[in-house]
Structures are given as structure tokens and as C-alpha cells.
């Protein structure tokens, strides 16, 4: 295993926002995502809430990023992570990591998810904290061989699956306990009424 900088194994690109006062730039067919659309339950994002037009792309000189790109919110808030399921555009609240052949995007996804506090500590700015492209490029990651990355991701996926299953089971148990208590209350009220 070797330690490398993200900038050595990923191309890091930022997004841009087309002018919001140009209606011909909006409500098109192209995905344009913002950090507000990401949450902890999302691994792969396939659609954005807002869409832009081809005219917006041309006039604003927007750069798309391909499916498989790791999206990292770089401000407001720092540290939301997802993987693009298809080609997308985004606002400037992201630093997008286009993975080289040396790094598996889901391995990078899990790495970044585990480093939210660290990423926030790297934030700079008075009004709101932001991490720059240079900061992201210089983040170091332990990088095993790609085959090992796949194994690690497989194990992490299984752990997440088990946690999700246990959470569902706990929710059902909680509902059962609540319904049992409600049933007891109903029975005791009926006994009083009789």
C-alpha cells in the first residue's frame, strides 16, 4: 500500500452556475446538481432537481463530469459525498474527483465519507468555510492495489447493508412495542368502561 495525494490519482474539477436571471438557461434536460440535493442515504445520484439547457452550457462554458465521478461538496456544507450515476454539471459548491485507473471511485467515496471532520478542519473563509481545489489535491490517501480496493468496498458495502437491515428491524420492534402498549391502554379503558 502506498500513500498518495488525491491530485495524483484524480482530476479535480469545480462547477459553475449559469446566470439565474436568464430563463433560457434553465428547465432544460441536462442535470445540474447542488450540494443541497445530497444526503447521507445517497451513494449514487442519477438525477438533479434543477436542469439546465445546452445554451447554458455553451454560453457559460460549463464543463460536464462523467458518470462515475465522485462529487464532494466543498462549501455550505463541506463533506457531502456521492457518485455521479450519469454525466452531470454542478454548481461551484463541489470539487468533483474524476478517478484515474489507479483508484476505484467507491473506495474514494468511502474514504471521503470517513473524513468529514478532517475535511471541515481544512475549510478556509470568513463568511463560510470552503475547501479549495489545491487543498483537495493535497489530501493524502492510503492506496492499496485496485484489487484490494474492490475487496475493501465489498466488505464496507456488506457492513452498510447489515446496519441498514438492523435499523429496519429495530424500527419494526419499536412499532411492535408501541402497538403493544396502545393495546394495553385500550384494554384497560375497555375494562373500566364495562
Region roles according to the model:
Residues 1-41, 56-60, 189-194:
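Low-complexity, Lys/Gly-biased intrinsically disordered segments
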Residues 1-16, 138-146, 150-153, 165-194:
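Non-catalytic DNA-recognition/assembly elements of restriction-modification systems
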Residues 7, 11, 31-34, 95, ...:
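Generic alpha-helical structural context detector
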Residues 34-35, 49-113:
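A short beta-sheet element
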Residues 38-39, 77, 118:
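Active-site/binding-pocket entry motifs
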Residues 39-51:
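Short, basic/aromatic beta-hairpin or loop at an interaction surface
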Residues 74-77, 88-95, 125-147:
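A short glycine-rich beta-alpha junction/loop motif
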Residues 112-116, 120, 160:
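Short amphipathic alpha-helical signal-transduction/dimerization elements
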